[in-house]
Amino acid sequence: MITIDIELKDKPGELLRVLTPISKYGANVISIIHSREEKRGGKVPVRIVIDVDDKDKLKKILEDLEKEGAIIKKIDGKDKKVYLDVVVIGHVVDTNVRDTIDRINEIGLVEDLDLIMPHPDKESSAMMRIIVDEDKIEELFYLFEELEKEKGLLFIKSIF
């Protein structure tokens, strides 16, 4: 048995959509816990316990779950995704914020962005919520260093 902890958008039909890949690859659903009372940031935590007979099928199920928009948090209690809150200080907008986001999205996903622009001549700041695979954190931190040098920005990281 495999326990998969995911997060889904809090809207009708999301749970049904993630059950399709499980069925498609012949896995059996043992249990589902849909914790709406623990909703955070418009996302609902869901724990699905499945019985699947080989690792290739599990890999395909996980890939399809992500294609369906599920954020896979843990597999059998092991972290798969890490959330980072990153404060970016500098001329965030003037140094092409779209490019910065696109480059981060090649490694992880900028899930949320709050931008503060006090005055066009002054530095701005942004708070980014980034979701990244645990094994790609070092690559993301290296990108932050590149962006700091290239764009004169400062990235302040917080992992949870």
Swiss-Prot record:
Residues 3-80 form the ACT domain. Coiled coil: none annotated. InterPro entries: ACT-like_dom_sf, ACT_dom, ACT_ThrD-II-like. It holds the Pfam family ACT. CDD domains: ACT_ThrD-II-like (cd04886). This is Uncharacterized protein MJ1601. It comes from Methanocaldococcus jannaschii (strain ATCC 43067 / DSM 2661 / JAL-1 / JCM 10045 / NBRC 100440).
